[in-house]
């Protein structure tokens, strides 16, 4: 009986995830299965495969704001989208308001994506040196300025990916999430680890819950 009850709840949870429609801005997401952006992996071919398995939303590899501003052809090609993968989000990263706005406008005007996502969660050193990704979590005012200016510059919904904090001494995901909401973002994704954890240890779902309750 207990096994049957457990199976029933598992199927019920899966049903809720698969059929519950989510809306991000003016974009309808048919279910709550969202493919996370992964550098070097989530190109157009990979995204199409994931779409065939029923994902509600797919997200591109992270795209450098500076590379778009400089007109790097290889980076521009990362904006390629197949008609079969909608809805799809293009994720950009950077640490400067002006270049992020310029990059977001380029994506808005030259890509047929449905959503523009801002990466404020990547913990790798190369991104941190560019004052981007989870580096930005140390500077809430800059987070607000980037999101607000990007939102105002584009016609598509803007979402933001964050972590719970830069390290265990500076967990500020609720504060950051409130600022992102105030800046006009349509949705927030939270990785339940700090920047210092990288991809190790356990994700702290309690902080994710706190963000969910706060915004």
Regions picked out by a protein language model, each given a short descriptive name:
Residues 15-215:
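Flavin-dependent oxidoreductase catalytic cores
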Residues 1-8, 13-17:
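Short, positively charged and aromatic/hydrophobic N-terminal segments
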């Amino acid at each position: 009986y207990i096994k049957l009850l457990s199976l029933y709840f598992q199927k019920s949870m899966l049903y809720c995830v698969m059929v519950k429609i989510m809306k991000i801005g003016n974009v309808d997401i048919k279910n709550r299965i969202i493919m996370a952006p992964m550098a070097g992996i989530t190109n157009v071919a990979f995204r199409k495969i994931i779409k065939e398995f029923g994902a509600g939303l797919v997200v591109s590899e992270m795209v450098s704001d500076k590379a778009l501003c400089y007109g790097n052809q290889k980076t521009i090609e990362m904006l390629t989208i197949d008609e079969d993968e909608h809805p799809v989000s293009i994720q950009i990263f950077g640490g400067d308001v002006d270049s992020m706005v310029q990059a977001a406008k380029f994506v808005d005007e030259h890509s047929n994506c449905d959503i523009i996502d801002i990466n404020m969660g990547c913990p790798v050193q190369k991104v941190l040196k560019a004052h981007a990704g989870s580096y930005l979590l140390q500077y809430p005012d800059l987070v607000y300025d980037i999101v607000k200016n990007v939102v105002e510059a584009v016609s598509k919904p803007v979402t933001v990916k964050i972590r719970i904090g830069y390290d265990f001494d500076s967990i500020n995901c609720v504060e950051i999430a409130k600022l992102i909401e105030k800046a006009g973002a349509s949705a927030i994704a939270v990785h339940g680890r700090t920047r210092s954890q990288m991809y190790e240890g356990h994700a702290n779902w309690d902080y994710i819950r706190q963000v969910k309750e706060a915004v």
